[in-house]
């Protein structure tokens, strides 16, 4: 007799949360958001089922990078052409594409498989304070007490 509850994909209830990234360290924000995207904050967490909630991150341009990460942390990507490796520092990414900086950080904390890619689709990041998910009535989540 099995007494462990295993969630089924059809019976998962999802909520929308909104998180303000102003003056919060990038790694601390990313761990909390990745945990919510996976559903680890729920008692019905099941590792092989997407039980997570939707998360909207606003004010990505005001994220805090501690220490020397603004100049010392380098992100690489390849253009798929010979000799096409490109690099940007975390400070440059925060200035030009702050959404991409947060998305990259959070996606690195999710599982590296099809389930993780599905969970990453529930993340919405905006550089400013405006977002276009008002119809979902997101619940404001204060993560300062969670970090």
UniProtKB/Swiss-Prot annotation:
CDD domains: Ribosomal_L13
UniProt keyword annotations, A-Z: Ribonucleoprotein, Ribosomal protein
An individual GO BP term: translation
Gene Ontology CC annotation, any one: cytosolic large ribosomal subunit
InterPro entries linked: Ribosomal_uL13, Ribosomal_uL13_bac-type, Ribosomal_uL13_CS, Ribosomal_uL13_sf
Keyword Ribonucleoprotein included in the entry's annotation: yes
GO molecular function, one term: structural constituent of ribosome
UniProt cross-references to SUPFAM superfamilies, sorted A to Z: Ribosomal protein L13
PROSITE patterns attached to this UniProt entry: RIBOSOMAL_L13 (PS00783)
Function (record text): This protein is one of the early assembly proteins of the 50S ribosomal subunit, although it is not seen to bind rRNA by itself. It is important during the early stages of 50S assembly.
Subunit-level organization: Part of the 50S ribosomal subunit.
NCBIfam families per the UniProt record, alphabetical: rplM_bact
Similarity annotation: Belongs to the universal ribosomal protein uL13 family.
Full protein name: Large ribosomal subunit protein uL13
